[in-house]
């Protein structure tokens, strides 16, 4: 995985999501601490019932399925994004996001 390529890919996500120290919820929730986090648990973000009740714990495989087609993975999600179909881009994006701990600091 290429973290720098993942950072470039994250530009597609940045209009709605934030990562890093001082990140705040936007249209979408903060993505700090994503690996191992339960879906629908970021404080202060108004998740859809579908997201809160999905039972998802984020790992690479789940993320890749979700980011391929968010509305297919979680019908009823508020996320309005067509998805990322390219396998390498998905891997790079996961590598980029995975480096941020829950506090937004890089591991």
Swiss-Prot record:
| Keywords, in A-Z order | Electron transport, Heme, Iron, Metal-binding, Periplasm, Photosynthesis, Pyrrolidone carboxylic acid, Transport
Q: Which Gene3D superfamilies match?
A: Cytochrome c-like domain (1.10.760.10)
Which InterPro entries did the record assign?
A: Cyt_c-like_dom (IPR009056), Cyt_c-like_dom_sf (IPR036909), Cyt_c_1A/1B (IPR002327)
Q: How is it modified after translation?
A: Binds 1 heme c group covalently per subunit.
Question: Where in or outside the cell?
Answer: Periplasm
The UniProt entry's GO biological process terms, in alphabetical order, are: photosynthesis
Positions that bind heme c: 13, 16-17, 79
**At which residues is Pyrrolidone carboxylic acid found?**
1
Q: What would you give as a GO molecular function for this chain, any one?
A: electron transfer activity
Q: Does the keyword Mitochondrion apply?
A: no
Tell me which GO cellular component terms the UniProt record holds: periplasmic space
Q: Has the keyword Heme been applied to this entry?
A: yes
The superkingdom of the source organism is Bacteria
Q: Name one Pfam family in it.
A: Cytochrom_C
**Family affiliation:** Belongs to the cytochrome c family.
* Protein role: Cytochrome c2 is found mainly in purple, non-sulfur, photosynthetic bacteria where it functions as the electron donor to the oxidized bacteriochlorophyll in the photophosphorylation pathway. However, it may also have a role in the respiratory chain and is found in some non-photosynthetic bacteria.
Please identify the protein, giving its name as recorded: Cytochrome c2
Species this chain originates from: Rhodoplanes tepidamans (Rhodoplanes cryptolactis)
